[in-house]
Amino acid sequence: MLPGAAGASFEFWPAMDAFVKLDDRFRLYFTAAFVRGMEPDATSGEEIYRDVTFGAHLDLTLKPIFRPRLRTSDWERQRYVWVRAGYRYGTTIGEVADPFEEHRGLLEQTGRAPLPSAFWLVERSRLEFRDVDDTSSTRLRFRLTCEREMPIGGRETIPYVNGELYYDFRADALKRQRYQSGVEVILTHRWRIEPYFSYQVEMHSDDEDVAALGLNFKYYR
């Protein structure tokens, strides 16, 4: 069992992502993500909260070396090194006890390396410049993913597991760990779906740990 699992709250994380290829080096990425959960409330006992995040990003290939024997046409998995710059806006929906508003700029780098038995190791480093309720902070996120392409039930799929660390420069401390397992299922040339389970450990906070089911819909053009 992960640390604090017995006292974790549960959330649902649906999202819609759209990827627009501009050429062999550039791609646009848009996202709309939703969070639904429950937290204790002094008057009503429990309160449902809903958060929403919108984002726009530009992806750029740094090392466009195409992988051999790739089953499916995939912009990011065909590239060994690429970077992303973007902006995200997040806020609560409706009246809640603890509303928030966040503006977030981000820069990230993703690299891929082959492993034995057709597995791949994917490293992502992300620097986030956050303004949450007029309070500024900078956060570094480092994620390692292990994935493998394989056919399941007549469809190409990409099962994966990953772990991620969050470092807050303002607190000068590791603030969060996140562990995730899921599978990306290729439905058509343009559509994919990604169900997953995620567990989030809060390391230096009174906030509860979070267990979440996620469902991403992905559109490629």
Go through each PLM region and give its residues.
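Hydrophobic/aromatic-rich structural module bridging two neighboring secondary-structure elements via a short loop
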Residues: 44-110
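Transmembrane beta-strands of outer-membrane beta-barrel pores
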Residues: 4, 32-38, 87-93, 113, ...
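Outer-membrane beta-barrel domain signature
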Residues: 2-7, 41-47, 94-100, 131-135, ...
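Short glycine/proline- and aromatic-enriched beta-strand/turn motifs that initiate or cap beta-hairpins
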Residues: 1-46
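Repeated loop/turn-to-beta-strand initiation elements of outer-membrane beta-barrel proteins
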Residues: 24-30, 63-69, 80-83, 116-121, ...
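Outer-membrane beta-barrel "beta-signal"
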Residues: 60-61, 109, 209-221
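Residues that define the transmembrane beta-barrel architecture of outer-membrane proteins
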Residues: 10-12, 48-54, 101-105, 136-142, ...
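Detector for outer-membrane/organellar transmembrane beta-barrel domains
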Residues: 104-106, 110-166
